[in-house]
Amino acid sequence: MLRKTLTLISLRRPFSSIPSKTLTPHQKSSFESTLHHSLITHDTDQAWKVFRSFAAASSLPDKRLLNSLITHLSSFHNTDQNTSLRHRLKRAFVSTTYVIEKDPILLEFETVRTVLESMKLAKASGPALALVECMFKNRYFVPFDLWGDLLIDVCRENGSLAAFLKVFRESCRIAVDEKLDFMKPDLVASNAALEACCRQMESLADAENLIESMDVLGVKPDELSFGFLAYLYARKGLREKISELEDLMDGLGFASRRILYSSMISGYVKSGDLDSASDVILCSLKGVGEASSFSEETYCELVRGFIESKSVESLAKLIIEAQKLESMSTDVGGSVGFGIVNACVKLGFSGKSILDELNAQGGSGGIGVYVPILKAYCKEGRTSEATQLVTEISSSGLQLDVETYNTMIEASMTKHDFLSALTLFRDMRETRVADLKRCYLTIMTGLLENQRPELMAEFVEEVMEDPRVEVKSHDWNSIIHAFCKSGRLGDAKSTFRRMTFLQYEPNNQTYLSLINGYVSCEKYFEVVVIWKEFKDKKAKLEHALADAFLNALVKGGFFGTALQVIEKCQEMKIFVDKWRYKATFMETQKNLRLPKLRKRKMKKIEFLDAFKNWARITT
């Protein structure tokens, strides 16, 4: 709506119906004062009324005020809530063109740029073009570099680069005829105009005329310039012209053909000549291997052309032929097979159908054709299908890279598809992948978070002899901790025995997990057993572990063993908070009744009395 309004207003002559009358110096001063106050207070409507009063008298305010007004009207961040952006921008356009026609010397170049910047944000290409044409018509020559880029952007965004071509030509004419170098369009503008000729208008005559204009202006073409011409020549089937372009690029020292080849592919696809498009891909591989530089956009354009023509067989054939030409050092992501299948996936076309066609033709597209499909499966959560495809890949003698394995294993663990994750890891081991550490940690962490200690134990047993995996004590600790947390203390104890049998050294965390597990199930005698083993190993006792032992032993009533722990703490100068264990005793053993004295209970009574004396318990 805004663009339409501005376009219509650009066709009218502003203030043409306002009768002219002369302002006295006093009136002009009063108007300027009112205008200044209106701008300060952001009263847009009042400021506009004052400007109309000036226009009615065929006059204009002070230069500074005039530029401030137009800048205010153009602002996208104007705080005036009473006037819409559409109205303000319309008024900015009208006032600017009026000043250009009336007295352009009052208009600052930066003010014109501000207006055009706002038109760009409003996507108003029609008024922007009209404003520049008004400047030309009234010989108000603003340096091209102040407005050219803005006009190109707004025209390109609206798909009207062809409209920019007229302004470009006029600016070239002015620069030459008036000998004004600052009006010369630069290379960016020349390429935009060339894009309009080649891509939008597809006019050979206009394109060649524009190249001549560039030569007159001294603007040297770049790779993009040749690319636009290559598109047009391919679109028209002018092979000789393309050969001339390549020779010219060689003469000018352009080594890369990436843009040229991409543009040729685009032109051939647009004309329906898919065979020639395929030839460009293969030709690029015969040269310096620039197929690896083709963008995703180019591959999507190529694939779309083949799919619309129902030529999947030809697409598969292209992959096979390209695979024969690609060097062994070609990166997976840079292969033609990867580019084509990845484009299929992006366009929503089944990449698997390409694989089926490759198999039907008895050819190979290399590992690159599989990677996009695997990534798509992972993104969609189809991890079991991805794993099945990996099995097929391995059986064909191909090998995936570590990053692809990592991605698939992470996706499988996220989906809780532990079977697929473990299967993929086994495949990694069998294919002799050098780095297994990251995937190993991913699986162990995921199984721990999901409380699957039995799978963790099986996994560790399976991989612990593999030199590429470092199984350490903390891995066993994680398994023991998970078993204890889920109440499976028998399994935790068995894992502990297995750990020590394999000569992995238990540490404080190992014992803490076991103690906390037994305490939660009130199996305090097991803590006594652990203490005996700990003491026999002559392991180093730390404060947290001593606290865990004492807490469990006091709760269980094993005061003799508790005294051993206290003695060890004193020996190692570990602080023991006796008030804490006094509280634990009073909480758990306050109803303790000594049985009738018997010979076999005497030792227990002695330990109880000794502990009470140590903790200063008088009851």
UniProtKB/Swiss-Prot annotation:
Residue stretches of each PPR repeat: 186-221, 222-256, 257-292, 295-329, 366-400, 401-435, 436-466, 472-506, 507-541, 542-576
Superkingdom field: Eukaryota
PROSITE patterns: PPR
Compartments where located: Mitochondrion
Record keyword Transit peptide present: yes
Record key words, sorted: Mitochondrion, Repeat, Transit peptide
Similarity-based family: Belongs to the PPR family. P subfamily.
Identification of the protein by name: Pentatricopeptide repeat-containing protein At1g68980, mitochondrial
